Amino acid sequence: MQLSKHFKLEEMTKSMTATRKGIDNSPGAGDIKNLENVCYEILEPVRAHFDKPITVTSGYRSEALCEAIGSKKTSQHAKGQAVDFEIAGVPNIQTAYWIQNNCDFDQLILEFYKKDDPAGGWVHVSYNEQGANRKQVLTYDGKSYENGLPDMKWKDGVVVG
């Protein structure tokens, strides 16, 4: 099922853990609508701006899958409202800054960020059509969360050094 021009339901629900453990990771109709919103409001604009394919590492997670990976059942992933992703050749911090400045979102987290590796980790972003999006921005270094994104050196819209 095509969710948007560049994103399919299959890539937004794919999980090696679900496959290995025999967990049904099928979203309901409301979850699918939320995934479509994430695609249209976040992923498609990001893909258009960077003009590169996006690799989704985690989209929808059933409650059973959330439990299996140690995530909260209340995670926005369990509602189809969140996605984790990367773009080959684009530092994740650059992607996160672009989303912060150009998209409506509920929560944006630069996950497992290391200052000496701006391409490390991944971007987590959520979108909530049902309510006001909080525009919460966090950076997680693997130990603790900090408000906002780290300061970076920029030249012509690209992270340097």
Predicted regions and their residues:
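Acidic, His- and aromatic-enriched active-site or binding-groove loops in soluble protein domains
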Residues: 73-93
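Extended, low-complexity, intrinsically disordered C-terminal regulatory tails
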Residues: 44-70
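Short, flexible, solvent-exposed loop/turn segments with mixed acidic/basic and small polar residues
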Residues: 68-78, 114-116
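A broad, low-specificity signal marking well-ordered, structured residues that form hydrophobic/aromatic
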Residues: 54, 83, 122-123
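Extracytoplasmic cell-surface/polysaccharide-interacting catalytic and binding patches
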Residues: 1-49, 142-161
